Amino acid sequence: MSGSLPLRLVLASASPARRKTLQAAGIEPDVLVSGVDESLVASDRADELCLELARLKAQAVLTRLRPAQDQRTLVIGCDSVLEFDGQIFGKPADSADAIHRWERMRGRSGVLHSGHCLVDVTAGRRAEAVASTTVHFAAVSDDEIATYVATGEPLVVAGAFTIDGLGGPFVERIEGDPGTVVGLSLPLLRRLLAELNLPITGLWSRGTSTHPTPGTSATPKPNPGA
């Protein structure tokens, strides 16, 4: 029965940050890059846009996937966009675009939306949702903007910023799940799995360590009789 099969998660994304987020939570995903051209999809609503792109990424990987008979295969597609001043910001077109965005964003706030589409390939079911987090940007200087953009980091991420990289000091605070800003919300992933009647603990990699309980040692005591 599929319910007793070990779980396999395929991440339909080239994002190192999403992969690291999963790995830090004890989940080792397989990675298949979707190849979806994000510029071909348009919408007036940021939440609808990121969810549609997440669906397309998951679907693109599904067409190339070969599910294993001895595993229950899941595919997660994600996409993120920044909603700012009524506009939708994905990745900036170039350095000049990134600089212009930061000149507008500094000292102000926006909402980062991350769409998640989780497909249970084995059972033929799907669960999806959008996570949103408010981001408050620091009042950065022109020099800070120019130096940050010159690193290239803002050019490859939605909204032209990160919170887990060089852009971290330029974000004063957030309201919501930080994983949403990175591009994958673990609490939302748990809820989507629950909709499919699956526990997130079933995705933990074999050998995932646990911290020793108080009063115990992680190192086995020697056997006097050995």
From Swiss-Prot:
GO terms for cellular component: cytoplasm. The active site is at 79 (proton acceptor). Residues 206-220 have a biased composition (Polar residues). Coiled coil: none annotated. GO terms for biological process: nucleotide metabolic process. One of its GO terms (molecular function) is nucleoside triphosphate diphosphatase activity. Its main location: cytoplasm. It is an enzyme of class 3 (hydrolase). Pfam families: Maf (PF02545). The keyword Endoplasmic reticulum does not apply. Residues 204-226 are annotated as: Disordered. It is found in: Cytoplasm. Its EC number is 3.6.1.9. Keywords: Cytoplasm, Hydrolase, Nucleotide metabolism. Its cofactor is a divalent metal cation. It catalyses: a ribonucleoside 5'-triphosphate + H2O = a ribonucleoside 5'-phosphate + diphosphate + H(+); a 2'-deoxyribonucleoside 5'-triphosphate + H2O = a 2'-deoxyribonucleoside 5'-phosphate + diphosphate + H(+). Gene3D superfamilies: 3.90.950.10. Belongs to the Maf family. Nucleoside triphosphate pyrophosphatase. May have a dual role in cell division arrest and in preventing the incorporation of modified nucleotides into cellular nucleic acids. This is Nucleoside triphosphate pyrophosphatase. It comes from Salinispora tropica (strain ATCC BAA-916 / DSM 44818 / JCM 13857 / NBRC 105044 / CNB-440).
